[in-house]
Design a protein with these regions (language model features):
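Conserved histidines in hydrophobic membrane contexts and catalytic metal-binding motifs
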Residues: 30
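Catalytic core of pol beta-like nucleotidyltransferases
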Residues: 1-27, 35-41, 51-98
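Short beta-strand->loop micro-motif that forms the acidic, two-metal-ion catalytic signature
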Residues: 46-49
Length: 98
């Protein structure tokens, strides 16, 4: 089943308080094919997030939890001031936050 933008955003919105408490996620949204309503059956969900205390251990657990609640594969990208300019521009143009 192809990921649907409205469903993904609703799930993320409902999960935000838990993600903040467990992982320190301060902002979360989607970008890419799902945000553009252009996803296919094989599409993963590109998730952009900001986190108060980022570390690899926390990000691995966040990814696993998001895949569990969304029932699909996710790619996580932490938004920050210093990042790949092309990717940053894509996120700024396509990003839909909850």
């Amino acid at each position: 089943m192809r990921p649907q933008k409205t469903k993904i955003l609703a799930i993320l919105k409902g999960s935000t308080p838990v993600l903040l408490k467990k992982y320190g996620v301060t902002r979360i949204g989607i970008f890419g094919s799902v945000a553009r309503d252009d996803a296919s059956e094989e599409s993963d969900v590109d998730i952009v997030y900001e986190m108060s205390r980022p570390n690899l251990f926390t990000v691995v657990h966040l990814k696993a939890e998001l895949e569990n609640i969304l029932h699909c594969s996710v790619d996580l990208v932490r938004y920050r001031e210093r990042m790949n300019p092309f990717l940053k521009k894509r996120i700024e143009n396509e990003g839909v936050y909850v």
